């Protein structure tokens, strides 16, 4: 008798996705981040659901309701800390996942890559509206500054900003709609993840060598299920350590002060995972130019497949491209640091140079390196 998991319409989908899925035998720990991101999403949805039961999206009570969750709700402090730090873990895994994709040429699976970039943008939008909800000083001013960027759009800018605000400033209407967005977006993300996996399973996973893996595949279970569980345990240990021992390490002290429209904090800055983009935004003296650079810093990922000039898929055997990749990584770390610094010299200049080099490495140097490596690999006879 055939096993039910191979015949039942619903079980068959699960079986073909997580149990009998043919997987390359040589994928490294860099391939763990997909499952970790899935777990992050589940953790965020569950903790978020419990927080939403006690949160009130009203300007007068939002801040107090978060304090109430932490003080009076059973394990409310833990749920809130896991949710806040879970976002940091989510972005850490996201950045590593995207970095893996760039390094090993996974972007050549165009449909999977494109839906992944859209997912990244959606997660960033969700995190942004979520950061506004506690209604602290940085929540309020972060929302004011970032939504104000839309006013740089010619002709319709100001109307668009007031439309998003639901008035003439960030107020009750803004908070209420941001809560609605923050509640619905994770479920949209969940649906997009299914599409992301659907496209991935059309082609199968890439592998570190970038070569066709069809000659050597193994079933996903038990080999990669056990490997994913190990990664999951490590992530949960880090997340719980962060949530229990230093829950406010990655937060902003200004957010312990209730929102006050009459008092601007000395340094308005977003959470750490947006700082690289914020640094690029601030590097351009023109408002519209800054907004376009901010968008380009993320949307540049969409043209990665067009910039691939090498005959090899992966960077595993391409030392020049590898050097550029790690230069790009260092560059992003510098941008993250600059994004958190005040707008004064030498930070302004460092930020501008880092922004220029970010785009130069991706658009000019990486394609050139690929072409050069192709030339170096050509056999040269006397």
From Swiss-Prot:
The keyword Membrane applies. A ubiquinone binds at residue 201. Heme b b566 binds at residues 97, 196. GO terms for biological process: mitochondrial electron transport, ubiquinol to cytochrome c. GO terms for molecular function: metal ion binding; ubiquinol-cytochrome-c reductase activity. Keywords: Electron transport, Heme, Iron, Membrane, Metal-binding, Mitochondrion, Mitochondrion inner membrane, Respiratory chain, Transmembrane, Transmembrane helix, Transport, Ubiquinone. CDD domains: cytochrome_b_C (cd00290), Cytochrome_b_N (cd00284). Its main location: mitochondrion. GO terms for cellular component: mitochondrial inner membrane; respiratory chain complex III. It is a multi-pass membrane protein. It holds the Pfam family Cytochrom_B_C. Heme b b562 binds at residues 83, 182. InterPro entries: Cyt_b/b6_C (IPR005798), Cyt_b/b6_C_sf (IPR036150), Cyt_b/b6_N (IPR005797), Cytb/b6-like_sf (IPR027387), Cytochrome_b (IPR030689), Cytochrome_b_C_euk/bac (IPR048260), Cytochrome_b_N_euk/bac (IPR048259), Di-haem_cyt_TM (IPR016174). SUPFAM superfamilies: a domain/subunit of cytochrome bc1 complex (Ubiquinol-cytochrome c reductase) (SSF81648), Transmembrane di-heme cytochromes (SSF81342). Component of the ubiquinol-cytochrome c reductase complex (complex III or cytochrome b-c1 complex) that is part of the mitochondrial respiratory chain. The b-c1 complex mediates electron transfer from ubiquinol to cytochrome c. Contributes to the generation of a proton gradient across the mitochondrial membrane that is then used for ATP synthesis. Belongs to the cytochrome b family. The cytochrome bc1 complex contains 11 subunits: 3 respiratory subunits (MT-CYB, CYC1 and UQCRFS1), 2 core proteins (UQCRC1 and UQCRC2) and 6 low-molecular weight proteins (UQCRH/QCR6, UQCRB/QCR7, UQCRQ/QCR8, UQCR10/QCR9, UQCR11/QCR10 and a cleavage product of UQCRFS1). This cytochrome bc1 complex then forms a dimer. This is Cytochrome b. The gene is MT-CYB.
């Amino acid at each position: 008798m055939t096993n039910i998991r191979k015949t039942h319409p619903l079980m068959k989908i699960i079986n073909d996705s997580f149990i009998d899925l043919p997987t390359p035998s040589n994928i490294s720990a860099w391939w763990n981040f997909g499952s970790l991101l899935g777990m992050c999403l589940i953790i965020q949805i569950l903790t978020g659901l419990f927080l939403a039961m006690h949160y009130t999206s009203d300007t007068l009570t939002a801040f107090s309701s978060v304090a109430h969750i932490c003080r009076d709700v059973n394990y409310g402090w833990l749920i809130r800390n896991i949710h806040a730090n879970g976002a940091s873990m989510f972005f850490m895994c996201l950045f590593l996942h995207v970095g893996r994709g760039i390094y090993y040429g996974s972007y050549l699976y165009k449909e999977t890559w494109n839906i992944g970039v859209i997912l990244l943008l959606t997660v960033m939008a969700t995190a942004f509206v979520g950061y506004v909800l506690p209604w602290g000083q940085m929540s309020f001013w972060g929302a004011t500054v970032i939504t104000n960027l839309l006013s740089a759009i010619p002709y319709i800018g100001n109307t668009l900003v007031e439309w998003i605000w639901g008035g003439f400033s960030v107020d009750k209407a803004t908070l209420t709609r941001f809560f609605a967005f923050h509640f619905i977006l994770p479920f949209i993300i969940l649906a997009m993840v299914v599409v992301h996996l659907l496209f991935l399973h059309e082609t199968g996973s890439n592998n570190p060598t970038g070569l066709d893996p069809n000659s050597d595949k193994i079933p996903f279970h038990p080999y990669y299920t056990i490997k994913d569980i190990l990664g999951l345990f490590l992530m949960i240990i880090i997340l719980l350590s962060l949530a229990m021992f230093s829950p406010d390490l990655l937060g902003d002290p200004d957010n312990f002060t209730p929102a006050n429209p009459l008092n601007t904090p000395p340094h308005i800055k977003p959470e750490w995972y947006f700082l690289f983009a914020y640094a690029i935004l601030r590097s351009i003296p023109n408002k519209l130019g800054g907004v376009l650079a901010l968008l380009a810093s993320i949307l540049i990922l969409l043209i990665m497949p067009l910039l691939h000039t090498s005959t090899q898929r992966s960077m595993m055997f391409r030392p020049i491209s590898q050097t550029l990749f790690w230069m790009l990584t260092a560059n992003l770390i510098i941008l993250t640091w600059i994004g958190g610094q005040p707008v004064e010299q030498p930070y302004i200049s460092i930020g501008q140079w880092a922004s220029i080099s970010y785009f130069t490495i991706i658009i000019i140097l990486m394609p050139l390196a690929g072409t050069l490596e192709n030339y170096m690999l050509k056999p040269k006879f006397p």
